[in-house]
Amino acid sequence: MIVETTNTLVAAAASLFSVTFSPEVRTAYVSRGKVIDDRPIQVNSLRADMKLGAEAQFGRIGAWHWGYNALTPRVNCAEDQFAAEFDWGAYYHYDLELADGWSLGNEIMPDWIIMPSADPVFEWRVSQSLKNPYVVPFWLMRRDQPSSRNCYFNVGLMKPISFRTASADWLKPLVITPMAMVEFGNSSLMTARYGRQESGGAVPTGLQAIDFELRADYAVTENFGVYVSILQFDLLNPKARRQSHKPNCRDITVFAVGVKLSF
């Protein structure tokens, strides 16, 4: 009886925790409205969280890590010969149930960005997404603290297309997600990203870029999946375009392939 009770408690505790690890390879790196690196990179993403309540009725808390390493020497856009970045964060996530099939996802995260060639950066990330059976709108804001005051914002739409009801069994684990997004930055971020104008003035706050992505996820098993994606990034801000002298640093197509491990 004691053994059964112990096993039940252990199983209940284990069900509160989950870990997702996703290594991938990309042909380039785009971040906050700029082509950071136009050479192949290897990316690792790790997310570990714990439910607050058996059904996560009080949300979830967790830790997050994202990092990349360049796979080849510098090409056009990268400032460093061999670039790398390591992000670490802790987050709180809460899904507010609105109706059957509708929920508002809310997340806040303090994040530390570490690059070997620069001082560490601390930022806040706040995001929301309205999950529903149709098209999912989402937005994200990133604000550096305390000194630079760079502020980044994006808003977009995505549509996960599931094949669970397909007659062919091999199609059922497939999910295809098209996404469209526009990116904005305040003057501080825009100037830091692209440099000052030829007149010496700062690049003003405004629209940065537009992104279109098509991603396909395939669940091989309950705990293992693979995915591929193609992203088209286009820099729209005319002042930023003038500051980005290489064509590949203004507009770029990024391919990615990776695996997803869930526990």
Predicted regions and their residues:
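Residues that define the transmembrane beta-barrel architecture of outer-membrane proteins
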Residues: 17, 38-48, 82-88, 104, ...
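Transmembrane beta-strands of outer-membrane beta-barrel pores
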Residues: 25-31, 58, 65-71, 94, ...
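Surface-exposed loop and membrane-interface regions of Gram-negative outer-membrane beta-barrel proteins
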Residues: 56-118, 236-240
